[in-house]
């Protein structure tokens, strides 16, 4: 009886970990000269809404001279592949 319960517990724990992945796509700018970029970054599960993700991403981006303009959306790992080409060098960089 203990083995099936343990197996189910492990499966549920692993499924919960996978579901907890959260990503945000965003637009940033840098002045002088004006440079605009689109990117994708992972954010913590607790910040998996556009407003909360903005609060997490803004300091990361600012430390490299970028100003966050907007967080377009938040999504799970299923949305990564379709955004990879558009994000280019800003794919999971920050």
Which residues does each PLM region occupy?
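Terminus-proximal functional modules
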Residues: 2-94
């Amino acid at each position: 009886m203990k083995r099936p319960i343990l197996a189910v517990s492990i499966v549920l724990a692993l499924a919960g970990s996978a579901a907890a992945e959260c990503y945000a796509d965003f637009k940033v700018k840098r002045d002088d000269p004006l440079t605009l970029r689109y990117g994708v970054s992972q954010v913590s599960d607790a910040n998996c809404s556009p407003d909360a993700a903005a609060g997490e991403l803004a300091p990361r981006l600012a430390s490299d001279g970028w100003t966050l303009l907007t967080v377009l959306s938040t999504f799970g790992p299923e949305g990564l592949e379709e955004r990879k080409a558009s994000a280019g060098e800003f794919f999971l960089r920050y």
